[in-house]
Amino acid sequence: MQHDLTLSRAAALDHLARAIPRTDRAYAEGRNTDRGPEVQPSTTALSPYLRRRLLLEEEVIDTVLAAHASGEAAKFVEEVFWRSYFKGHLETHPSIWTDYHRLVAEGRHRLATQSGLRQVFEDAVAGRTGIEGFDDWASELLHTGWLHNHARMWFASIWIFTLRLPWALGADLFLRHLLDGDPASNTLSWRWVAGLHTRGKPYIARAENIRRYTEGRFLPSGLDENPAPLDEVVPHATLPLPSPDPLPGGEVALLLHLDDLHPESLPLGSARVVRVGGLLAHAPGAAESVRRADEAAMADALVRASARFGCPAELVTEGWSGALPVVTAWAPVGPSAEVLPEGCRRVRRHWDDLVWPSATRGYFQVRKAIPTILRTREEAAGAMPLVTGRTSAP
């Protein structure tokens, strides 16, 4: 994975087509192995496209299940559902995101006032800790915008339990530098490693596990392999899933944002799009490589939207929508949702309505619901057909 990754719908479909042969049992058997940045990853690396919905979760699953028996692709399908689970969980626990921002600010204050902590932090970010593997992953993150999922878990565990650094500062580092940095997946994954998501059950990076799944490349010493999990005084409250907004009929302005860049498939009802605007809301302090990727993905979506709806499509400026009602895809908790204009109508995809209600607790609820969700999609009259190989409306 490199900084020059092409973020477009066409590139996403091409990447998906090339990844399909690796989504069967071979994926389940090899996905935990990190062979390093110079080797093709053992995972599919579809996440930068899924994060911006240049690919839709349901179309990826449909495509995979059209190529493999469900039993052969079960592990891959579950991993796609993890992404939807995290989004639904943060949507029903928004105080986690608010608290994360508070902890980032608190952590930065500690860095400014505690020289010892600041030195450990700076060494960790620069890859100067002397911990084998960790320093390599720090460099890989900054230079490529990518880490294998298992490396992310090891890195986070070492950051929290061996280096004793604030977990929120590590999550912030990832969100600013990862090309697939997703507010929900990133924040909740760091909380899971810390033992906050599944309370009292942290993920512990063990030297032997690292040696095994890096095929002997790394064998770190000095890791804390018996840490106490982090804790919170008050668990975050579960809130009802907010309802989508009623859609107007007639002419509308469509607002695109970085959480959903597939306007061709949005369920817009009788609304007729006559103007399209693109809203760029990067993670605060995002690396230049991430900003460029976001901008390229948005530019591609605007071109496609203009072709699909036959109207102007450009980045938003003041007064871009005129007197038209503004319609937008549902923006889950994160930077885009925080800057949506007041009064815009949010439309939510059927996929999210199927998955998110089961995401209020642990992943097991979603996992148990997978067969029903897939069957419901198959039976729904409006289920989206496969779109692989097409760059226009499905």
For the regions a protein language model found, what residue spans apply to each?
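Trp/Phe/Arg-rich N-terminal binding region typifying the photolyase-homology
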Residues: 2-17, 21-78, 82, 87-88, ...
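Active-site-proximal binding-pocket segments
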Residues: 50, 55-58, 63, 69-247
